[in-house]
Amino acid sequence: MGGTFDPIHYGHLVAASEVADRYELDEVVFVPSGQPWQKGRRVSPAEDRYLMTVIATASNPRFSVSRVDIDRGGPTYTKDTLRDLHALNPAAELYFITGADALASIMSWQGWEQMFESARFVGVSRPGYELRHDHVTAALDGLAEDALSLVEIPALAISSTDCRRRAAHGRPLWYLMPDGVVQYVSKRRLYRTPPDSGGGETLDTTTILPAGNNT
């Protein structure tokens, strides 16, 4: 599961768990981005975001955290994340999971055509969200029917943008994210400067889920 995780919250965790259950995936790998290339705001230091992700996922033996994007350096592109994860798990079938609203702009991603050769795409959304992606569907004409699918996740009413805003204004973060992450945000005094609005964020993430036995 790749993304900024700034901060990670229950929406990310529930989305990963639900998709893993639906597609019978063996492992969920969370991949905090190094330097997100499409973010229009300053993100927290990569080490802070990495440690929050480790804290949030520690209690689930099915979850793990990878540093491939952080250690690579430079802007983080999904095509590179997929390439590196495939190199580490050559026998795994990869699932790339992202917010459904991000799929509308997927053709602006660097090397997006090759990404569909490396992974199946799953868009996660809040209940009732309708994805208008005719141009994406047309571009994918000729690929397998399951190359792209949608999954509704009720917990996506939670967003990283709102969590940052609440922290900036001293509002509680309890029950929006694991207790350890709440304590980390407080100890490190993260998000004390009011954040940019960030638009209508639903899930500040893209997701990579290797299914080692599903080849």
Curated annotation (Swiss-Prot):
Protein's GO biological process: NAD biosynthetic process
Xref: SUPFAM superfamilies: Nucleotidylyl transferase (SSF52374)
Key words, A-Z: ATP-binding, NAD, Nucleotide-binding, Nucleotidyltransferase, Pyridine nucleotide biosynthesis, Transferase
Alphabetized InterPro entries for the sequence: Cyt_trans-like, NadD/NMNAT, Rossmann-like_a/b/a_fold
Leading EC class: transferase
HAMAP family: NaMN_adenylyltr (MF_00244)
Official protein name in the record: Probable nicotinate-nucleotide adenylyltransferase
Organism of derivation: Mycobacterium marinum (strain ATCC BAA-535 / M)
Lineage summary: Bacteria, Bacillati, Actinomycetota, Actinomycetes, Mycobacteriales
Designated gene of the protein: nadD
